[in-house]
């Protein structure tokens, strides 16, 4: 695979290899055949980041080869959304001959939605001033004249200039209902929107008929907790990043959801609060003991669950675990399988043509 060529003819083979690999990794814990969810074969990434290479009067997007560290020029990127590809061409054309916008520009980040909105961030090794803002506004207006629904942001050390806004609103059809998700620039969002829809619908399917409340750790912008709210009496969710918490609160209101409570704290802190080890001012007015959480949902970082959180989740009858790293999932399962068994197993091809796998497991108490 090269940045400008996807081996789409190999899609089925690479997916089959992942299925075999996941089954092998999960063999000590389950003999289930994974439910497999396919990605679009191209234009599946909704975000992308590129370094900018200055070559005399020219400049262009590059990425670095992971093995050799050599730079690779990228003029088109079929893994990314069609909107990102349109913007890549338009941004280079708009910046190349503009001394103010191109001077010390070293990176461009793109974030797009299925609803055809975009935020483009230009990163600089220089101070950004009013002249930069004027030129950036002219570029933004020129892009919009090309029917590109785009918001521009300038970033430099300790500086962020959002010309209009630093977010876009995604609209996803999830099990017959449109979900609105505010996505903030430089915050985590699911990179493959088509796969995200399938992950949300799978999570809804495995939790249908649930009793009681749901607890979610690492909720981000509320991606899962808001979609799952329809299956539970109440949802209690934690997140540490301020922009994500603010986006989650917006998303609760935008989706007219009244049974989700977001708390800004780390999973480790929440564990201490639940166990009565510490009291937190942030929890004033929230009666943790009133929640009857029968199900806990975790979507941890690549490092997986820490040992304290492992112990905490074992107290719940049902554990729904979405993993972006099956190796750390299996490490966690060495502990979790002592008290729980795997009921459902899914493979989500979030990153086609790469080694990476995303998977989901539903665990129930033995």
From Swiss-Prot:
Q: Which GO terms describe its molecular function?
A: rRNA binding; tRNA (uracil(54)-C5)-methyltransferase activity, S-adenosyl methionine-dependent; tRNA binding
**Which positions bind S-adenosyl-L-methionine?**
190, 218, 223, 239, 299
EC number of this enzyme: 2.1.1.-, 2.1.1.35
Q: Provide the top EC class.
A: transferase
Query: Which chemical reaction does it catalyze?
Result: uridine(54) in tRNA + S-adenosyl-L-methionine = 5-methyluridine(54) in tRNA + S-adenosyl-L-homocysteine + H(+); uridine(341) in tmRNA + S-adenosyl-L-methionine = 5-methyluridine(341) in tmRNA + S-adenosyl-L-homocysteine + H(+)
A cellular component annotation (GO) from this entry? cytosol
Domain of life assignment: Bacteria
Secretion signal span: none
InterPro entries the record matches: MeTrfase_TrmA_AS (IPR030390), MeTrfase_TrmA_CS (IPR030391), SAM-dependent_MTases_sf (IPR029063), TrmA_MeTrfase (IPR011869), U5_MeTrfase_fam (IPR010280)
State the family named in the UniProt similarity comment for this chain: Belongs to the class I-like SAM-binding methyltransferase superfamily. RNA M5U methyltransferase family. TrmA subfamily.
Name assigned to this protein: tRNA/tmRNA (uracil-C(5))-methyltransferase
- In its UniProt entry, the species of origin is given as Escherichia coli O157:H7
């Amino acid at each position: 695979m090269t940045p400008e060529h996807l081996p789409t003819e190999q899609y089925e083979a690479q997916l089959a290899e992942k299925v075999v690999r996941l089954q092998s990794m999960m063999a000590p814990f389950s003999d289930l055949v994974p439910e497999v969810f396919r990605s679009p074969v191209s234009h599946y990434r909704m975000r992308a980041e590129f370094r900018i290479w200055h070559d005399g009067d020219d400049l262009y997007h590059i990425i670095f080869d992971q093995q050799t560290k050599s730079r690779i020029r990228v003029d088109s990127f079929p893994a990314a959304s069609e909107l990102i590809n349109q913007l890549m061409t338009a941004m280079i054309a708009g910046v190349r001959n503009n001394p103010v916008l191109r001077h010390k520009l070293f990176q461009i980040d793109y974030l797009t939605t299925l609803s055809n909105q975009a935020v483009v961030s230009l990163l600089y090794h220089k101070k950004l001033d009013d002249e930069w803002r004027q030129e950036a506004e002219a570029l933004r207006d020129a892009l919009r004249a090309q029917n590109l629904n785009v918001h521009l942001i300038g970033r430099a050390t300790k500086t962020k200039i959002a010309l209009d806004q630093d977010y876009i609103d995604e609209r996803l059809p999830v099990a017959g209902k449109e979900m609105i998700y505010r996505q903030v620039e430089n915050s985590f969002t699911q990179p493959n929107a088509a796969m995200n829809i399938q992950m949300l619908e799978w999570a809804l399917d495995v939790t249908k008929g649930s009793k009681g409340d749901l607890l979610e750790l690492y909720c981000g912008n509320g991606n899962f907790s808001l979609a799952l709210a329809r299956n539970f009496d109440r949802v209690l969710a934690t997140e540490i990043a301020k922009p994500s918490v603010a986006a989650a609160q917006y998303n609760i209101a935008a989706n007219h959801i009244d049974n989700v409570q977001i708390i800004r704290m780390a999973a480790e802190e929440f564990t201490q609060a639940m166990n009565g080890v510490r009291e937190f001012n942030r929890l004033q007015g929230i009666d943790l003991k009133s929640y009857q959480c029968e199900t806990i949902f975790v979507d941890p970082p690549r490092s997986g669950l820490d040992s304290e959180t492992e112990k905490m989740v074992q107290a719940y009858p049902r554990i729904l675990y979405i993993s972006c790293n099956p190796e750390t999932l299996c490490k966690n399962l060495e502990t979790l399988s002592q008290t729980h068994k795997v009921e459902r197993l899914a493979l989500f091809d979030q990153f086609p043509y790469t080694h990476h796998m995303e998977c989901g497991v539903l665990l129930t108490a033995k």
